[in-house]
Amino acid sequence: MKSIMVVGTTSHAGKSLISTAICRILSRRGWRVAPFKGQNMALNAYVTANGGEIGYAQAVQAWAAGVVPWVEMNPILLKPQGDMTSQVIIRGRPVGRVNAADYYEQYFEPGWRAIEESLQHLGTEFDLVVCEGAGSPAEINLKHRDLTNMRVAKYLNAPTLLVVDIDRGGAFAHVVGTLELLEPEERQLIKGVVINKFRGQRSLLDPGIKWLEERTGIPVVGVIPYLQEIFPAEDSLDLLERKTHKAHADLQITVVRLPRIANFTDFDPLESEPTVAVKYISPKQDLGHPDAVILPGTKTTIADLILLQKTGMAEAIQNYAASGGTVLGICGGYQILGQMIADPEGIEGQAGRYQGLNLLPIRTVITGQKIARQRQVSSNFPQLGLPVNGFEIHQGRSRVEPQGDSQAFQPLFDDVNLGLVDSCQSVWGSYLHGLFDNGPWRRAWLNRLRQQRGLKSLPTGVANYREQREQMLDNIATEVENHLDLTLFLP
């Protein structure tokens, strides 16, 4: 099986970006390429056509390769749920919940079998597999149970790229230290080093590169500049630090960064709008007076609801809505906006019933059976008849409660189970992830906010975010290709 492995000296070294770029580079050269990450821990997920869950980053890599995402591209997905526990998803299907201490005892062997079977399947369907590692391949305390770094590289005998982030400092120490901690047979697979996120004058770096190559015997095959493209992140650590100021922003939209925020990639299309500034705040911060407030998806809906109530953010959102402010809840955020959430089986922790924000007339019951599926629907609001594509991932079932005024709340789509909006179009809720990827729907929703400000409406005949994402992937691939020599890695 032809393959390339990409590992990093640390988390956030740029493995996902480099792997994605290589997928697009080789696809443009005529290769049929598949991405692969044996095990991923992420709350950003995507639902494949057959209803399986994989990490969103692997879906992006599949799109970069010009292919449809498959569950085999990410056979193990761990979704943290708090209290050191994670939901375990193997080959796209949830198989249990486990704490960190017991995970490898229970799932190491079935996990490795899933990895082997997935790689074998991809090998029969594609010319080359681009494999991405996780964290560092040199974590001494974890190496004996590695499922996604050098164990995969050795299994495939894959030529391996070692990526290091020079922007954080200490890059040379990271490279040398990582190589020193690898076993001899692992180190032999490292065919090149990639220095990522470089800013400055290349000539000042050259003496360091010369020393590194002489010290390690491994060539530096790429120096990638710091790229300004918005690339989908795998975790939410950087959300509060994102630069949100835009000189010409007409609208300010605030997203509450819940502790277990999930699928915050839902908001990348909003961030791409030139006239919209998206700000992420913690539940402990002041809500302020934005044009709209969004409660995103979450893996622990009840725990995050309780936190919103304890911090006063729940009351702030209720007061904001009462004053005419626009509130949108997506997935878990939609459930939080309802009247009540019940967890009779203790799926999320302690069994019980919890009062929601009471902004939408729904009651939700958390069940053990997860819904994960792609959807194609038609909108009722903010404009009738717009095609909307997205996907559902949730374990709650929500029921709309009868209202005295039958017109007070209306179905958001032609499927009444996917969401609601009030008669003033101020409080919105939906189970649909990828809502803002739909360009005409996004613009119609933003235009309502603009009208409230007395601003001119924006054209709604715009392309879906997919086209902007394709351009982003092309830009990233071109930049990386200009600074990366893949000669040693291709047959």
From Swiss-Prot:
Residues 250-441 form the GATase cobBQ-type domain. Gene3D superfamilies: 3.40.50.880, P-loop containing nucleotide triphosphate hydrolases. CDD domains: CobQ_N, GATase1_CobQ. The keyword Transport does not apply. InterPro entries: Class_I_gatase-like, CobQ/CobB/MinD/ParA_Nub-bd_dom, CobQ_GATase1, CobQ_N, CobQ_synth, GATase_3, P-loop_NTPase. GO terms for molecular function: ABC-type vitamin B12 transporter activity; catalytic activity. Pathway: Cofactor biosynthesis; adenosylcobalamin biosynthesis. GO terms for biological process: cobalamin biosynthetic process. It comes from the Bacteria. Keywords: Cobalamin biosynthesis, Glutamine amidotransferase. The active site is at C331, H433. NCBIfam families: cobQ, PRK00784.1. Catalyzes amidations at positions B, D, E, and G on adenosylcobyrinic A,C-diamide. NH(2) groups are provided by glutamine, and one molecule of ATP is hydrogenolyzed for each amidation. Belongs to the CobB/CobQ family. CobQ subfamily. This is Cobyric acid synthase. The gene is cobQ.
